[in-house]
Amino acid sequence: MSNITGLTNKIIEDAKVSSKEIMDDAKKKEKIIIDEKVSIAENERKLILSKAEEESKVRAGRIISNANLQVRDMKLSAKIEVLDNVFNAAVEELSRMTGGELLNFIKNTILLLDIDGDEEIIVGENEDRVTTEFINEINKELNAKGKLGKIKLSQKRIKIKGGYILAKNGIEINNTFESRVKSLRDDMEAEVAKVLFS
């Protein structure tokens, strides 16, 4: 019986040693698995933080870019408003011409035009300085230049700040102050902007 007791004790001892080895091995494997999972979780945390930081930088960049665009648009709008004011002031200044200055402007510009001389002159609705006598003077000078000299003052009046339109057969030569300043603006806007904004 002592053999059986000894054998049983030996089996129990071996089982204890074996279970201790199994437990130690399991603890080592458990530590390795936990360390791996912690490492993976830490890497994912870093990746998530990195992505969040990158996204916030991109978002911040977009916000800054949009703000810069808005500022640029506001500056551009302000510059356009200033240019509008400058060219509108030019039209207003022209519209304050004296009667003599206006008549000289009309006569001189008509005499420079390549026209037949039988057009109709249309002036502003409140313009009373352009008279039939004045048109007759222009016609005499047109005759002297070999033109027909039959320009007529139209009964039709238009809403303009000053100047005139010559019309014949549906074709118009627009020499209103607004049109002349617009034409000058197209040619000079970059130059004027350079003077104003540099």
Curated annotation (Swiss-Prot):
Sample GO molecular function, one term: proton-transporting ATPase activity, rotational mechanism
InterPro entries with a match to the protein in the record: ATP_synth_B-like_membr_sf, ATPase_E_C, ATPase_V1_Esu
Highest rank taxon of the organism: Bacteria
Residues spanning the membrane: none
Gene3D superfamilies: ATP synthase, E subunit, C-terminal (3.30.2320.30), F1F0 ATP synthase subunit B, membrane domain (1.20.5.620)
One cellular-component annotation, GO: proton-transporting two-sector ATPase complex, catalytic domain
UniProt-listed SUPFAM superfamilies: F1F0 ATP synthase subunit B, membrane domain, V-type ATPase subunit E-like
Cleavable signal peptide: none
Keywords from the named record: ATP synthesis, Hydrogen ion transport, Ion transport, Transport
GO biological process terms, semicolon-separated: proton motive force-driven plasma membrane ATP synthesis
Pfam families per UniProt: vATP-synt_E
Biological role stated in the UniProt entry: Produces ATP from ADP in the presence of a proton gradient across the membrane.
Family membership: Belongs to the V-ATPase E subunit family.
HAMAP family (alphabetical): ATP_synth_E_arch (MF_00311)
Protein name in UniProt: V-type ATP synthase subunit E
Natural source organism: Clostridium novyi (strain NT)
Lineage of source species: Bacteria, Bacillati, Bacillota, Clostridia, Eubacteriales
Gene that specifies this protein: atpE
